């Protein structure tokens, strides 16, 4: 059981890192626009998905550990 939880944590961390670096993100579309970006929100949008994934994986691991 502990091996499965470690594997789940490792996979979720790898996926989170790949989402943050843009490997699994939406990086295939060209980013050339004529509009100016007024805030840094689009640059931080991929970080939110990765941290949500890490939070859910951590919650699952804690629930399995407590049961």
Curated annotation (Swiss-Prot):
Membrane found in the keyword field: yes
One term under GO cellular component: sperm midpiece
Tissue-level expression: Epididymis. Highest levels are found in the distal corpus and cauda. Little or no expression in the caput and proximal cauda regions.
Top-level taxon in the UniProt lineage: Eukaryota
Lipidation positions, renumbered (GPI-anchor amidated serine): 45
Signal sequence region: 1-25
Topology with respect to the bilayer: Lipid-anchor; GPI-anchor
Glycan attachment residues as annotated in the record: 26
Keyword entries, A-Z: Cell membrane, Glycoprotein, GPI-anchor, Lipoprotein, Membrane, Signal
GO terms for biological process, alphabetical: positive regulation of cytosolic calcium ion concentration; response to bacterium
Subcellular location: Cell membrane
Prosegment residue ranges: 46-67
Stored Pfam families: CD52 (PF15116)
Chain's role: May play a role in carrying and orienting carbohydrate, as well as having a more specific role.
Stored PANTHER family: CAMPATH-1 ANTIGEN
Name by which UniProt lists this protein: CAMPATH-1 antigen
UniProt organism field: Canis lupus familiaris (Dog)
Lineage of the organism: Eukaryota, Metazoa, Chordata, Craniata, Vertebrata
